[in-house]
Amino acid sequence: MPWIYATEYVCDMISASKNYNPKNFKPETTYDYFIKHAKNYYMSQGTYEYVKWCLARYRDLGFKGLKKKDTKAKYAEIAAKYPRTEMLTSMRLSEDLIPG
């Protein structure tokens, strides 16, 4: 997933967490939800690692940790470790989508 869409996904997750539970929202809420449910999402290993990193930065530093310069650099670092495309062997309905 390109940097811009992966970053938009992170923003969408933070926004949803704030809007659906405004009274009990904490920065770690979004990170915890993602870790718990990410295995059910179709996403590449690189995207998973990037989103996880962004949400951890948000949890620890708030929006200050999600500056464009930092997120673009981290995305490039993560993207360099993985192939540009990944093929899922099948649509597994009863197993985790992200192995591990």
Task: Give residue ranges: language-model regions.
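Metal-dependent phosphohydrolase cores
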Residues: 1-100
